[in-house]
């Protein structure tokens, strides 16, 4: 099972976020008790099922002589990672540091990205989807992926 689709949600005043039922089901199928990791990257908060996160972290930590930029990336992504389990109501708590990094306000969008999901501020996400993606479809075609409708 992969994370797909979008879900519009609201953060409560304590930073709690109700996960969509489909996302909760995926977490429960991929990790004991629905354990997950939240971290920040690319202007949003990123959620991984715990086993997928451990695999990513292990691969990253095996890099030999990482560049300064890679070490800084590790500080942001791994240093900012927070393990958690959803509460009985299916909520996770997004930390103040993640909310600040991603500019999250009350209205957010959860976006499935296959093995992970992203949490975007609604207005930032609206700007992303309003872009013209013609150049991306050309790039996909050059990579052998036909994405024409």
Curated annotation (Swiss-Prot):
Keyword Transcription listed? The answer is yes
Q: Which domain of life is it from?
A: Bacteria
Query: Which coarse location class describes where this protein primarily resides?
Result: cytoplasm
A single GO BP annotation from the record? negative regulation of DNA-templated transcription initiation
Q: Where is the SpoVT-AbrB domain?
A: 6-52, 81-124
PROSITE patterns (alphabetical): SPOVT_ABRB
Where in or outside the cell is it found? Cytoplasm, Nucleoid
Q: Which UniProt keywords apply?
A: Cytoplasm, DNA-binding, Repeat, Transcription, Transcription regulation
UniProt cross-references to Gene3D superfamilies, sorted A to Z: Transcriptional regulator MraZ domain
Protein's UniProt keywords contain Metal-binding: no
Q: Which GO terms describe its cellular component?
A: cytoplasm; nucleoid
Quote one Gene Ontology molecular function term. DNA-binding transcription factor activity
Quaternary structure and interacting proteins, as annotated:
Forms oligomers.
User: Record's family?
Assistant: Belongs to the MraZ family.
Protein name in UniProt: Transcriptional regulator MraZ
Organism name: Nitratidesulfovibrio vulgaris (strain ATCC 29579 / DSM 644 / CCUG 34227 / NCIMB 8303 / VKM B-1760 / Hildenborough)
Q: What is the lineage of its organism?
A: Bacteria, Pseudomonadati, Thermodesulfobacteriota, Desulfovibrionia, Desulfovibrionales
């Amino acid at each position: 099972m992969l994370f797909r689709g979008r879900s519009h949600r609201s953060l409560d005043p304590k930073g709690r976020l109700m996960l969509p039922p489909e996302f909760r089901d995926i977490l429960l199928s991929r990790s004991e008790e629905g354990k997950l990791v939240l971290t920040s990257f690319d202007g949003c908060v990123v959620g991984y099922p715990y086993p997928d996160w451990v695999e990513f972290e292990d691969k990253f930590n095996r890099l030999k002589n990482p560049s300064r930029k890679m070490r800084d990336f590790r500080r942001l992504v791994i240093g900012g990672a927070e393990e958690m389990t959803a509460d009985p109501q299916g909520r996770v708590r997004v930390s103040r540091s993640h909310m600040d990094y991603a500019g999250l306000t009350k209205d957010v969008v959860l976006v499935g990205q296959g093995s992970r999901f992203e949490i975007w501020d609604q207005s930032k996400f609206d700007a992303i989807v309003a872009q013209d993606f013609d150049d991306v479809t050309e790039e996909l075609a050059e990579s052998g992926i036909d994405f024409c409708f």
